[in-house]
């Protein structure tokens, strides 16, 4: 029987621990969030993060970019936040305005303030399994927390990550590799027949491609663990990349959408923020 991985419940536990850590620190903890106010999704997401942060005792400084924002203007903003001792962590909410080079912006964030672990320095250390006191991108780290909470064995397992974005796929690949899984990274140019073969062999499948019904139960190895990072809207309803109903009869574990990875992402971002405060502001 398939067990549902309840991200909302695990996120609640994570948030309780974060709130206790914030209270114990006894100093202001502030997360600066740079975002494009023209993007409806970003505005909504930033609002959700700010509300949850406030509930945990974390202050937020939401900074909308100008309508005519350029790479240079956003880099200058990041530089000012890097130099501001009152700012604990910095989050660059993707997507930024058209024409702004996101990778340059991510990598301009000082490693000791990189709340989402997206800069080149931090991601390079992740791939070298040498993160020390830095943080990991919130979505893949949230997935790892979820797997750990449910005591899902990763060691020696065959894992398949579908999607190679800087926010999800690449750090997810590194985290699973560092946990001693044998990991395959598939992407939009992976031939369909090759992907089908990978799916049939994978013990753990983590997918985030933004395509509803991308994976069916018949694609999977019986007993596979399925982590759905996708978020799509079909007829006004939030759905993932996995056909949930068909996979339920095949998988041993599965995350629902909503209520799976999504709550873990926000909880992990705020957990990252208090970690930076403890390591670099205490």
Swiss-Prot record:
Residues reported in the UniProt entry to bind NADP(+): 163-165
Catalytic activity: (6R)-5,10-methylene-5,6,7,8-tetrahydrofolate + NADP(+) = (6R)-5,10-methenyltetrahydrofolate + NADPH; (6R)-5,10-methenyltetrahydrofolate + H2O = (6R)-10-formyltetrahydrofolate + H(+)
Keyword NAD included in the entry's annotation: no
A molecular function (GO) term: methenyltetrahydrofolate cyclohydrolase activity
Keywords: Amino-acid biosynthesis, Histidine biosynthesis, Hydrolase, Methionine biosynthesis, Multifunctional enzyme, NADP, One-carbon metabolism, Oxidoreductase, Purine biosynthesis
GO CC term (a single one): cytosol
EC number of this enzyme: 1.5.1.5, 3.5.4.9
Classification via Pfam families: THF_DHG_CYH (PF00763), THF_DHG_CYH_C (PF02882)
Gene Ontology BP term (one): methionine biosynthetic process
InterPro entries the UniProt entry points to: Aminoacid_DH-like_N_sf, NAD(P)-bd_dom_sf, THF_DH/CycHdrlase, THF_DH/CycHdrlase_cat_dom, THF_DH/CycHdrlase_CS, THF_DH/CycHdrlase_NAD-bd_dom
Quaternary structure note: Homodimer.
Protein family membership: Belongs to the tetrahydrofolate dehydrogenase/cyclohydrolase family.
The protein, known as: Bifunctional protein FolD
């Amino acid at each position: 029987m398939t067990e549902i991985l309840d991200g909302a419940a695990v996120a609640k536990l994570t948030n309780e621990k974060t709130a206790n850590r914030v209270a114990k620190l006894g100093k202001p903890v502030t997360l600066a969030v740079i975002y494009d106010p023209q993007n409806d999704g970003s505005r909504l997401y930033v609002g959700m993060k700010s509300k949850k942060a406030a509930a945990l005792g974390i202050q937020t400084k939401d900074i909308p970019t100008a309508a005519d924002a350029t790479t240079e203007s956003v880099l200058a903003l990041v530089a000012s936040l890097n130099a501001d001792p009152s700012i604990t962590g910095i989050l660059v909410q993707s997507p930024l305005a058209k024409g702004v080079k996101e990778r340059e912006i991510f990598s301009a964030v000082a490693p000791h303030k990189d709340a989402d672990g997206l800069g080149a320095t931090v991601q390079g250390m992740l791939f070298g399994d040498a993160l020390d006191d830095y943080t990991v991108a919130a979505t893949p780290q949230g997935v790892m927390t979820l797997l750990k909470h449910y005591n899902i064995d990763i060691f020696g397992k065959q894992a398949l990550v579908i999607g190679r974005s800087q926010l999800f796929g690449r750090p997810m690949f590194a985290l699973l590799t560092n946990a001693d899984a044998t990991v395959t990274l598939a992407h939009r140019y992976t031939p369909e027949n090759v992907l089908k073969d990978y799916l049939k062999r994978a013990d753990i499948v983590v997918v985030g491609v933004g395509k509803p019904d991308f994976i069916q139960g018949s694609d999977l190895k019986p007993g596979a663990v399925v982590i759905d990072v996708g978020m799509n809207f079909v007829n006004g309803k939030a759905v993932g990349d996995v056909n949930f109903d068909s996979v339920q009869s095949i998988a041993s574990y599965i995350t629902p959408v909503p209520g799976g990875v999504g709550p873990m992402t926000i909880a992990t971002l705020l957990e990252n923020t208090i970690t930076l405060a403890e390591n670099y502001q205490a």
